[in-house]
Amino acid sequence: GRELAGDVAVVDIGLDVSSATQHLVEAADVSAWWPNRSADAHKWNGAVRVIAGSAGMLGAGRLCAEAAARSGASLVALSSPGIDPQARSEIIQRRIPAVEFECDVFGDLDRFRALVVGPGLGRVDGTISSARAVIGEATLPVVIDGDGIFAAAWSADGAGPLLRQRGRPTVITPHDGEFALLAGHAPGIDRVADARALAAELQVVVLLKGPTTV
């Protein structure tokens, strides 16, 4: 297996790959996708709202906000329910209630271009309920990770009804355990096929985390 493969080099051997349906994402691909900032851009053109972190798991929110800033977000606002978030001074830090925080989030959410919900959020019932409300009612692209995935699936009907009705770009980032929570089974040998099947079922983009992320 992979542990015995040593160094692996990917080289062009002249095959026609024009009809390929699976691609390896490389640094050049990411660079090509990066949008150019317009000459009159300002901080609200690419602002990201992050709802993440909780007591004992503040690092998750901090890492998420830092990643958004490093990836080019023009402004990042971080909130951790019920506790003061921790991040470097360039990150806007807003405290929101531990439960029933959706009204606080929606207060100015229309100014942001993307929303992240879930890393280290915790699983208190009131927090999960508010996270579901935010995910379901947000009218901008949403990335759902960690406890946000748990919140989405926190229903007798699973995550499908909540995610399918959104009608906006949605990305979920499950590891194998969270994938099983959503799909009812762990990913098998063909992780690409399993990720595609879940994406089609939930009408979202699936980033399946692991040693080889799909």
Segments and roles (model prediction):
Residues 2-146, 150-171, 176-214:
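Small-residue (G/A/S/T)-rich helix-start motifs and N-terminal tracts that mark the onset
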